From Swiss-Prot:
Gene: TRK2
GO terms of molecular function: high-affinity potassium ion transmembrane transporter activity; potassium ion transmembrane transporter activity
Transmembrane segments: 52-73, 81-101, 110-130, 465-487, 500-521, 525-545, 549-569, 585-605, 610-630, 658-678, 744-764, 777-797
Location of the protein in the cell: Membrane
Glycosylation sites: N216, N233, N265
Species: Saccharomyces cerevisiae (strain ATCC 204508 / S288c) (Baker's yeast)
PANTHER family linked to this entry: HIGH-AFFINITY POTASSIUM TRANSPORT PROTEIN-RELATED, POTASSIUM TRANSPORT PROTEIN DDB_G0292412-RELATED
Membrane topology qualifier: Multi-pass membrane protein
Extracellular side: 74-80, 131-464, 522-524, 570-584, 631-657, 765-776
Function text: This protein is required for low-affinity potassium transport.
GO cellular component, one term: plasma membrane
Example of a GO biological process term: potassium ion import across plasma membrane
Protein's recorded name: Low-affinity potassium transport protein
Amino acid sequence: MPTAKRTSSRASLALPFQLRLVHKKSWGHRLRDFISGFLKSCRPIAKYVFPNFIVVHYIYLITLSIIGSILLYPCKNTAFIDVLFLAAGASTQGGLATKSTNDFNLYQQIVVYVITLLSTPILIHGFLAFVRLYWFERYFDNIRDISKQNFKLRRTMTLQQRELSGSSGNAARSRSFKDNLFRGKFVSREDPRQSASDVPMDSPDTSALSSISPLNVSSSKEESSDTQSSPPNFSSKRQPSDVDPRDIYKSIMMLQKQQEKSNANSTDSFSSETNGPAFIVQERHERRAPHCSLKRHSVLPSSQELNKLAQTKSFQKLLGLRRDEGDHDYFDGAPHKYMVTKKKKISRTQSCNIPTYTASPSPKTSGQVVENHRNLAKSAPSSFVDEEMSFSPQESLNLQFQAHPPKPKRREGDIGHPFTRTMSTNYLSWQPTFGRNSVFIGLTKQQKEELGGVEYRALRLLCCILMVYYIGFNILAFVTIVPWACTRHHYSEIIRRNGVSPTWWGFFTAMSAFSNLGLSLTADSMVSFDTAPYPLIFMMFFIIIGNTGFPIMLRFIIWIMFKTSRDLSQFKESLGFLLDHPRRCFTLLFPSGPTWWLFTTLVVLNATDWILFIILDFNSAVVRQVAKGYRALMGLFQSVCTRTAGFNVVDLSKLHPSIQVSYMLMMYVSVLPLAISIRRTNVYEEQSLGLYDSGQDDENITHEDDIKETDHDGESEERDTVSTKSKPKKQSPKSFVGAHLRRQLSFDLWYLFLGLFIICICEGRKIEDVNKPDFNVFAILFEVVSAYGTVGLSLGYPNTNTSLSAQFTVLSKLVIIAMLIRGRNRGLPYTLDRAIMLPSDKLEQIDRLQDMKAKGKLLAKVGEDPMTTYVKKRSHKLKKIATKFWGKH
């Protein structure tokens, strides 16, 4: 009985506590717990059924097509193969139809409407962003709270630095470092032995260097290199608490300046050290450094003193003011580590010579030397013997500042570090170091956690932007078109004659334009509206921003939001990260350079089709009855629809044959600009291409069909030949694009011709029938390419308003359905893409591999897009040739 009482009392005491715990969980947390439990139970099967995003995408589209056909078939107003064909076209935005859409009833049209909205690229990739956001919250504990605390800390320290500098923003850079340093309110005390005017802190003191005199050190026996020796005893060395921060700061400046002077006169060997800087490379030969020694009474703090003094307030103020001045020669590459490892061989009678040392980043490094870099630390004099001395702005000195000062004004002629890039805003408390495509190099555990928090907040904001974008532009589309369809009586009558309400026609057409479906509720598509500029112009806009122009519009919106957001806000931090590193968060958001290239490509392709239409069909019989202004608009509308949407404003079968060939080619390349942009901005681009070479530079891997650059001036041909033999050719950005194109062609061509071959077998009798001249191989190829490009254009068949596919047999229609599903997956990223991979141990391993790869290789400069660099280089060479040619004439 007493035992029962004790049990009940314990239960009664524990119950309120358990209820409080359950009460604290939000509905979102409970939903995530339910999803997590369900996924854990399905994990043994799911990892085989859904191994990656590509397979999930295939399964989703096929499932949606089957579900759509099941929902459409109960009306039984058409054969099941035609219903399946329509559902597959809706789920892939193919736009081909074996039966006019207006012949289906309202229920079936609504089903097509919903299926299309659930399968657009924006929705699928946006849903993937939501999944990654959910996984971030499940995989990282308290990531939301930690990232918020880091943001508050960065903002507080930034405001404090602005207050210390006496100004805000860029005005802090106008005050010199020396004037700021020796003000009483910044420095707690002055060095009694030296005045402020004697030693400017932005340059090393030459008198201090001249005061160095020999320090004789002898040993009774030669010490082994693997035994750690104690540093020499300085008679006047002060305790760490007695050393003025200015002394240690000047020591660092002297060390760095002497390193720079040694760069021009010596070539040092670099050993294999994984902790070295990512941009230092290994030389083949070792040289002894010049003999020098330190004065016995000179003061040079040890590394332990550096660690302690670097954390003091006064030293951090000094360094903060130094950074405010804008000189980032020494402290802007925080993640870089300058490791000096001494290889000592000192005899008994030798004086303390500067030992040979090594400094290298990785076990295997390239033999190339970084050019045009002023701060390459190759040598560092030292007075210590048999001791490993390291200088690391982040780890050795613990200089992990929690705020960035205002951005320094770049001095004229100053060449930026090829691995560093100025951040859009202070979303990190340290200056990151990059490789190709936003690869962060040399991160500590604390930095990775901070970066993960910033990426999480950026992804969370991006999800909100995507949701508003998708819903908002769909609403804007039908708000734009529905009132016009209801108020223009002439066109309202045309719509009603097709058995459709003008209001519903406006809703469906707006969705079809923004989703690039290409179906219309009028039997002749948009031919009846060839003289209505209002819907044609707005539909072109929604067609572009709903598909290939989506990354351009999305980045433009984020840029506008960034420019108008409040300074030092969490909102602006996230926007800045999205602008700087978009492909770490989303597959359809690109950096500035690739975005401009995508924009240029779209303009060129559309302009090419438009110009060809004007040249070849402007005065043809099919458009002659329309005014010239409307003809130009029809040509522009058709050129825009040819690549993605599939609407037609003119009968394509009556156009010039060369225009038909041009349209077929444009349908095939429709997805290539977007697909290549996705793949060449992939964070793991090299690994996705299979470039795992670690013994040489990433840029030295070439393909056989790359164009070899030649010297058109005829100079140094023999030298170029020798250099080509001695070292590998340099990998150009064009080579990566070529690799992506070759992969895409190998993915496409065999499938296209296999489908064409099967259809020609099934439709052989119709092709041979002389009474059906419009049923020919070219028309079938046009249909196959249209399906594979998920465009929806068709040459049609005489006296019908449907696609040519309506004349196919059941097997041929199944082949077209397979083309639609396969073609819809053309523009997906590679399996190895950070933007589609969920946070996991596997992702951490890939990041670690990428970091090790980057540390040992000289990656491309990140300040400029590689394709832009390539084009500039080629244009400069062409300009040089043209100048020489015209100079002779």
